[in-house]
Amino acid sequence: RNLGELFGGVPLVTEITSTPKYDYKRSTRMETYQYAIDEMENIINDLPVTTAEAGRLVRAAVQHNLCQLYIDKGVLLEAEGGDAASAYNKAISYANDVIDSGTYSLMTERFGARKNEGPEFYYATSAVEQTADRTYSSAGYPIEGNVYWDLFQVGNQDYQDGNTEAIWCAQSDYEVYKSDGSLACLDYPAIYGPVFRD
C-alpha cells in the first residue's frame, strides 16, 4: 500500500530470480494495489487470530491492511471516473471483521507496567498540591497517568501485554545496543508515510 501511495506504481516482482534482471516495468498504482490485495486475500485464512509471540502477523493485521487498500482503490477509481462503491463496501466489510471479532477493543482501564505509579512520578510534585478533583493545582491537568498514557509505555504496546487495541505492532528492543559494548549506539530507524494527494 505505501509503495503505491509513495511512488504511484512499482515494478511487481512475482517470481524469485537468481540472476540480475534489468528490464523491470513499472506497474500502475491500481495494479500495485490489486497485487497486494490478491496476495493478502490468498493468505488471510491461513493466519492465526492471535499469537503468543509479539510481532507475528495475525489475521486482523491483514484485514486492516485490506481495508486500507480497498479505500485507496476506491479513491483511485473515483478519481478516474469509475465506480468505487464495491471497493468501499469491501473496505467496510474488512473493518467490520476486525471490529466484530471480539478480539480487539478500546482500552478503558489503566493497565500494565506503570499503572500503579504515584503522582510524584508524573509531575515531580507532592500529592499535597493536588486539588480535590485530582488535578495538578497550577494547570488543571490530571495528575496521574491514564489509560492513553499506558498504551505507549515500554512493556505495554503489544496485544500479548494486555493491550487489546494493539493489532500488529512494530517491535522495539531498547537493550540491543548493549550487545556491542560501548562502541554501539542506538539506531533510530527512519519513519516514512504515504504522500498526501490533492
What do these predicted ranges mean?
Residues 5-6, 52, 62, 137, ...:
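Generic detector of intrinsically disordered, low-complexity, polar/charged segments
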